[in-house]
């Protein structure tokens, strides 16, 4: 809280007041958080996860959003470094970077504009829309496969 990045705690009193919730924790944790707290989210709120995989998260979070009447969109900012943790954060991390969206429906142009407007302060360069399955397939080849291959190469005799 000393850095000013955290303004307070999310709890039973503050969650209902949020218009935008960004779930920036691991996939299982994001889905569990929403399952545990979905009843507190205002029906007008927009909730996005920022996880690197979409199938598990969307499969669990879309039904929670439907049950409680708020909007959930899967999201994956395509930016970052090999470092993790708050001490490696940068204000310009997303400037010009692409953002992948997995909406509950592909024909809701107003929702896509709402997400784009909500994320505007981050400075994303472009938004693309896909399914959870297609997202995870693309990420497996473009992000995870190079890690697997380089690891195998390093460990080979």
Can you describe what each PLM-predicted range is?
Residues 11-48:
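Rossmann-like NAD(P)-binding element
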Residues 1-5, 12:
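NAD(P)-binding Rossmann-fold cofactor-contacting core
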Residues 13, 51, 76, 103, ...:
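Residues at the C-termini of beta-strands that transition into short coil/loop
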Residues 8, 46, 71, 125-128:
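Conserved beta-strand segments of alpha/beta enzyme cores
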Residues 36-87:
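Rossmann-like NAD(P)(H) cofactor-binding subdomain of soluble oxidoreductases
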Residues 93-157:
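Internal alpha-helical scaffold of NAD(P)-dependent oxidoreductase catalytic cores
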Residues 87-93:
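Short, flexible, solvent-exposed loop/turn segments with mixed acidic/basic and small polar residues
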């Amino acid at each position: 809280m000393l850095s000013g990045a955290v303004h307070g705690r999310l709890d039973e009193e503050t969650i209902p007041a949020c218009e935008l919730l960004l779930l920036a924790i691991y996939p299982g944790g994001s889905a569990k958080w929403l399952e545990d707290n979905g009843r507190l989210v205002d029906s007008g709120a927009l909730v996005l996860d920022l996880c690197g995989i979409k199938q598990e998260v969307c499969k669990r979070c879309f039904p929670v959003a439907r049950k409680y009447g708020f909007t959930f969109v899967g999201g994956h900012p395509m930016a970052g470094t090999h470092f993790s943790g708050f001490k490696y954060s940068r204000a310009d991390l997303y400037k010009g970077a692409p953002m992948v969206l997995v909406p509950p429906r592909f024909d809701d142009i107003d929702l896509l504009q709402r997400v784009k407007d909500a994320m505007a302060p981050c400075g994303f360069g472009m938004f693309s829309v896909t399914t959870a399955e297609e997202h995870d397939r693309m990420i497996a080849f473009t992000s995870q496969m190079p890690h697997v291959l380089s690891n195998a190469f390093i460990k080979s005799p």
